[in-house]
Amino acid sequence: MNVQNRGCIRRLSFRTLRAAWKRNAIAVIAIALTALLFTSLFTVALSINSSYETYTFRQIGGYCHGTFKEVSEAQAQAIAAHPKVKAVGKRTTIGFLDTGVFAKVPAEVSFMDDNCAAWSYARPQTGHAPKSGKEVTMDTGALKLLGVEPKLGAQITLTFTVGDKSQTAYEKTDTFTLAGWWEYDELSPVHYINISQKYAQAVQAEAAAAGLKPFRTDLNVMLAFPVDIRGQMERVDSDLGYSWEPDGGENVVRIGVNWGYTSARLGESVDVATVLAGIAFLVLIVFTGYLIIYNIFQISVTGDIRYYGLLKTIGVTPRQLRRIIRWQAILLWAAGLPLGLLLGYGVGAGMTPVVMARTTFGAGVSTVSTSPLISLA
């Protein structure tokens, strides 16, 4: 039987499995259960981390990776074109409200582009973003404080302070048309009141005539890889000839890192002991999984040793025997692994709210992770 017919080898492997279908069914179930165990474990672990990150993002007011602060138009274009930057979102703040009904939670009046609005949880769920004239969008909490019914086209009169905390010029009162709104998040640090770019430019020209410096424009960024966020942003500054230090001269572009990301916190406070503990934990998990799977195949192959010996006596080469066993392993994995991954993800997704309910955050902030690391684990 010293032939090179791979089709014959595959057929023999399949028929060998079918001949001992009860034992192999147990092997498939064992593989599926092992995959379920590790998949559900990693799903819960990564989902807890994702839930914590989302909770922090809501407290901060956004989930962009970081912000290049007070940039000019030329600097914004240069940063957006850098290969480490995947996407950018621009925001120009023209004023604020921090008295009266907004004394507890202040409001910021600003222009946000589509990316910035999405990353800041300020994209209208009803209506559309401000496009022209005196259109405005805000959250339902701000509308309630202003005594305005959420209705498209509603007229809203706002009195806000032009400028920012470092420079204030005068109060301005204007009547806006409500173009959209979104649900208020109790965790949000501010009320975002978004106006159109044309209105922001008009107020900026008015403020410049009154002697104010140009309004602050921040560039929020999403990086290609959310690892070592500060290091990557400093590299962008360095490559473009900017300094992130406040006393770096005229060409300063300061950096703000979103500390809601676990990778950002680890990058700044990582120590050798933490790294070694993490590596040891992963090695333990991988080794445990290896032992479980090894024992499954050991039991399966041991039961067929006599059969393989008979095949060898009639001319099957050691190489062909390895192929037969390899094909059996592939078939068993193909049957058990996808089932275990799907069931494990489902179990993990179902357990996440239960686990989160026993934390200080509660089940209401649970976010099920979809990280590819779950299946790779």
Report residues per predicted region.
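Hydrophobic alpha-helical membrane-associated segments
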Residues: L33-S40, V44, I285-G289, I293, ...
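Juxtamembrane interface helices immediately C-terminal to a transmembrane segment
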Residues: S13, L17, L36, S40, ...
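Basic-flanked hydrophobic alpha-helices used for secretion and membrane insertion
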Residues: L46-R265
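N-terminal Sec/SRP start-transfer signal
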Residues: M1-L36, R326
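Residue-level signature of the transmembrane alpha-helical core
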Residues: L17, V28-A32, V283-V286, R326, ...
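Small-residue-rich transmembrane alpha-helices
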Residues: L46, Y294-I299, R306, I330-G362, ...
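N-terminal membrane-entry
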Residues: E268-I285
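Interfacial "coupling" helices/loops that link adjacent transmembrane helices in transporter permeases
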Residues: T288-L332
